[in-house]
Amino acid sequence: MFASTVFVSLLAVAAAVPTNPQGQSCGNGNTVHCCNAETANKLTKGGILGALDLSNLLGQCNDVTAAVAGGAVPIKNTCSSQAVCCGEIHQNGLVNLGCTPIFV
């Protein structure tokens, strides 16, 4: 009985601990980008990729302006889709995984 009381008490305390909110900045020298399903036109203009409809699969992310990155404007008001932290923005390839989402 005592063990279950201690367990429930610890569970209640752990649930009540405030978490750090996901900020509007990225660590480790990464930059914030908005991914609003912007198509990669330079990849789909000609050749074999031009014949395929890859506009829904290929995309890029826009840099977030200094006012947004500095916290003057909330990211959720700027990004209509998803804000991400990118460390490797110079990517060459078909599948690039240099960004991680941040939740706002």
Curated annotation (Swiss-Prot):
GO molecular function ontology, one term from the record: structural constituent of cell wall
InterPro entries noted in UniProt: Hydrophobin (IPR001338)
Gene null: resulting phenotype: Does not affect the mycelial growth rate, the hydrophobicity of the mycelia and conidia, or the conidial virulence on silkworm pupae. Leads to thicker aerial mycelia in darkness and quicker growth rates under abiotic stress. Promotes conidia production and increases the contents of carotenoid and adenosine. Increases the biological efficiency of the fruiting body by improving the fruiting body density.
Family to which this protein belongs: Belongs to the fungal hydrophobin family.
Intrachain S-S bonds: C26-C85, C34-C79, C35-C61, C86-C99
Protein name in UniProt: Class I hydrophobin 4
UniProt xrefs under Pfam families: Hydrophobin
Induction: Shows a very low expression except at the early stages of fruiting body development. Expression responds positively to light irradiation.
Subcellular location: Secreted; Secreted, Cell wall
Reported function: Aerial growth, conidiation, and dispersal of filamentous fungi in the environment rely upon a capability of their secreting small amphipathic proteins called hydrophobins (HPBs) with low sequence identity. Class I can self-assemble into an outermost layer of rodlet bundles on aerial cell surfaces, conferring cellular hydrophobicity that supports fungal growth, development and dispersal; whereas Class II form highly ordered films at water-air interfaces through intermolecular interactions but contribute nothing to the rodlet structure.
The species this protein was found in: Cordyceps militaris
Assembly and binders: Self-assembles to form functional amyloid fibrils called rodlets. Self-assembly into fibrillar rodlets occurs spontaneously at hydrophobic:hydrophilic interfaces and the rodlets further associate laterally to form amphipathic monolayers.
Residues in the signal sequence: 1-16
Keyword Lyase annotated: no
Keyword list, A-Z: Cell wall, Conidiation, Disulfide bond, Secreted, Signal, Sporulation
CDD domains hit by this protein: hydrophobin_I
GO annotations of cellular component type: extracellular region; fungal-type cell wall
